[in-house]
Swiss-Prot record:
Belongs to the influenza viruses polymerase PB1 family. The gene is PB1. Residues 50-82 are annotated as: Disordered. It comes from Influenza A virus (strain A/Grey teal/Australia/2/1979 H4N4). This is RNA-directed RNA polymerase catalytic subunit. One of its GO terms (molecular function) is RNA-directed RNA polymerase activity.
Length: 757
């Protein structure tokens, strides 16, 4: 039978059907190969938007730099990055006037945080450009390598573990004549295998010392490595994103801390809050505009889109903003905060892996690394790539491109939001001094603008004025991609507003299903996602019940744990049937052991083990929750774990779920093939790091774990803690005198060894 799909929507209000048009089912597109082309696009575009600026040469690195600040005022609607310093400063001043004390208070909050933040803050985050190895590494490893190199070059401020001291080292490192680093390299040689008598290739990992002169070191310190952004839906072309090195990260973190503190106090800011809190904040602004537009006034809303937000932003503008925001603060604080924008004004973009060439006969493949693009003959490239390379050549130094204007994705989300809000703030009647006025919402590069005026001409005039004001600070509202509607219907950060926010359920689709962590976590995450969507996203009871059934089905297929009385044959069915037959109370078996599903939408908040505990056979309970079970490598499990779920837009978000430790909470072991590669040295460093952290956690269990404030090292802290604990245990009779003496002796030995080192 043919079904006319439009019939499905007859009873559905149009706004609720919006989510069916979203590209969120199925796998998102991933990029393959090199991101070099996308990075060159970004660099070339950024320079094009600022082309009428002034060219200068960086005296330290020799990099050509383009400065568009205070450039010509725009004469057309093309996007441009010519922000006017005085306009930005004035916008800041008006923002402060409407929010008395906002900058002052945020500075005080930030100053406190700056003095307390530990350097381990930088271990958060995933891939980071590791300047010592000139490629990406996990953040913790990149930080450890950086500190190790600093230490071997005589920089020791970071011993105490405060981030601010590490940043002092960074600043000092930039004045050094040269830096000595250790790099990993790989040797291959052919040897005869004793067992099989065949020739095999043996790889050995070498570490070699290398000296970087001041220029080379500065280039590396200012480098952002680039990658292709993966899993972006609804786009035909991929784009490049940047990952900064350890020298830049700490400074950016403090600037963003200050900006976050300001954003929290601004009602128009969509950051840093999220979810329902964000919806409530936005609904307030809309309500204000609706109630104030009396019967005589019209109110319209623009669902806004900005052209190339971060390619038109400029670090020099951010420097001006920070200089203004911190103007009455102590000198040291102003200096710390101004370093990030200064580094960004001198940044270099690493072009990535370069290009791969294949010969026509397909026998030969060769990699052209980015370093060669400056000198290689262009006849090998196709037309579009040739144009890109020609354009970028004047900017190249050692395989990196000088990129002074523009901000690369996701670096200063909070601070750029402050800039956007400062323009929205100018829409108050006391500033527009006419009959029209505006307000709105800003979240990084996304905005919604609400304009009120007595008539249509007034609305048009208000929009024009907003558009031109934005141009003055380097924000380019796209006239093609923004659209205007009567207030009451708009979209902002993928929230659809129609007299209240409509649940855009399709956003959550990717997070339904089996996560693939382990049987225990997956069950818990699956039901939590359904529960959360019933709370937050209008997932109705009938649909939730269906989602639950589909999830259980999916789960059983993933782990091949169909019910013990099923006809389905899998590798596991023999064992599961045997278990089913031996079990008296079959309802007590977990789904992952072939048991029935007891979940319904009323009990989703209860972990499965708790739900079935009373129904379990005693010997099954004993096997399931046995910490001595040799088949399980047990983590000490907190009562709540965090899972990473992938909503459709924005970064992966962390979601809490209840974790009950059972023999199903296994942790997969690391793939051994890594041990034969050049990554091996890095892996060993990482394990060492892990061991130290675990040891530290043992001494300071989470109940008593406060961030150490003071200047003792981890070892000193652990030794003094051991002494205190030993004394308490000895005095309360928990340990004998000999044991107490032995602990004290070990502590003294450790201290002695440290002194000798």
């Amino acid at each position: 039978m043919d079904v006319n799909p439009t019939l499905l929507f007859l009873k559905v209000p149009a706004q609720n059907a919006i989510s069916t048009t979203f590209p969120y089912t199925g796998d998102p597109p991933y990029s393959h190969g090199t991101g070099t082309g996308y990075t060159m696009d970004t660099v070339n575009r950024t320079h094009q938007y600022s082309e009428k600026g002034k060219w200068t040469t960086n005296t330290e690195t020799g990099a050509p730099q383009l400065n568009p600040i205070d450039g010509p005022l725009p004469e057309d609607n093309e996007p441009s990055g010519y922000a006017q310093t005085d306009c930005v400063l004035e916008a800041m001043a008006f923002l402060e006037e409407s929010h008395p004390g906002i900058f002052e208070n945020s500075c005080l909050e930030t100053m406190e945080i700056v003095q307390q933040t530990r350097v381990d803050k930088l271990t958060q985050g995933r891939q980071t450009y590791d300047w010592t190895l000139n490629r990406n590494q996990p953040a913790a490893t990149a930080l450890a390598n950086t500190i190790e190199v600093f230490r071997s070059n005589g920089l020791t401020a970071n011993e105490s573990g405060r981030l601010i001291d590490f940043l002092k080292d960074v600043v000092e490192s930039m004045d050094k004549k040269e830096m000595e680093i250790t790099t990993h390299f790989q040797r291959k040689r052919r040897v005869r295998d004793n067992m099989t008598k065949k020739m095999v290739t043996q790889r050995t990992i070498g570490k070699k010392k290398q000296r970087l002169n001041k220029k080379s070191y500065l280039i590396r310190a200012l480098t952002l490595n680039t990658m292709t952004k993966d899993a972006e839906r609804g786009k035909l072309k991929r784009r490049a994103i940047a990952t900064p090195g350890m020298q830049i990260r700490g400074f950016v973190y403090f600037v963003e801390t200050l900006a976050r503190s300001i954003c929290e106090k601004l009602e128009q800011s969509g950051l840093p809050v999220g979810g329902n809190e964000k919806k409530a904040k936005l609904a307030n602004v809309v309500r204000k505009m609706m109630t104030n537009s009396q019967d005589t006034e019209l109110s319209f809303t623009i669902t806004g889109d900005n052209t190339k937000w971060n390619e038109n932003q400029n670090p020099r503008m951010f420097l001006a903003m920070i200089t203004y925001i911190t103007r009455n603060q102590p000198e040291w604080f102003r200096n710390v905060l101004s370093i990030a924008p200064i580094m960004f004004s001198n940044k270099m973009a690493r072009l990535g892996k370069g290009y791969m060439f294949e010969s026509k006969s397909m026998k030969l493949r060769t990699q052209i690394p980015a370093e060669m693009l400056a000198s290689i003959d262009l006849k090998y490239f196709n037309e579009s790539t040739r144009k890109k390379i020609e354009k970028i050549r004047p900017l190249l130094i050692d395989g990196t491109a000088s990129l002074s204007p523009g901000m690369m994705m996701g670096m200063f989300n909070m601070l750029s939001t402050v800039l956007g809000v400062s323009i929205l703030n100018l829409g108050q009647k006391r500033y527009t001094k006419t009959t029209y006025w505006w307000d709105g919402l800003q979240s990084s590069d996304d905005f919604a603008l609400i304009v009120n005026a007595p008539n249509h001409e007034g609305i048009q005039a208000g929009v024009d004025r907003f558009y031109r004001t934005c141009k003055l600070v380097g924000i380019n509202m796209s006239k093609k991609k923004s659209y205007i509607n009567r207030t009451g219907t708009f979209e902002f950060t993928s929230f659809f507003y129609r007299y209240g926010f409509v649940a855009n359920f399709s956003m959550e689709l990717p997070s339904f299903g089996v996560s693939g962590i382990n049987e225990s976590a997956d069950m818990s995450i699956g039901v939590t996602v359904i529960k959360n969507n019933m709370i937050n996203n209008d997932l109705g009871p009938a649909t939730a019940q269906m989602a639950l059934q589909l999830f259980i089905k999916d789960y059983r297929y993933t782990y091949r744990c169909h019910r013990g009385d099923t006809q389905i044959q899998t590798r596991r069915s023999f064992e599961l049937k045997k278990l089913w037959e031996q079990t008296r109370s079959k309802a007590g078996l977990l789904v992952s052991d072939g048991g029935p599903n007891l979940y319904n939408i009323r009990n989703l908040h209860i972990p499965e083990v708790c739900l079935k505990w009373e129904l379990m056979d005693e010997d099954y309970q004993g096997r399931l929750c046995n910490p001595l079970n040799p088949f399980v490598s047990h983590k000490e499990i907190e009562s709540v774990n965090n899972a990473v779920v992938m909503p459709a837009h924005g970064p992966a978000k962390s979601m809490e779920y209840d974790a009950v430790a059972t023999t199903h909470s296994w942790i997969p072991k690391r793939n051994r093939s890594i041990l034969n590669t050049s990554q091996r040295g890095i892996l060993e460093d990482e394990q060492m790091y892990q061991k130290c952290c675990n040891l530290f956690e043992k001494f300071f269990p989470s109940s008593s774990y406060r961030r150490p404030v003071g200047i003792s090292s981890m070892v000193e802290a652990m030794v003094s803690r051991a002494r205190i604990d030993a004394r308490i245990d000895f005095e309360s009779g928990r340990i004998k005198k000999e044991e107490f003496a032995e602990i004290m002796k070990i502590c003294s030995t450790i201290e002695e060894l440290r002194r000798q080192k």
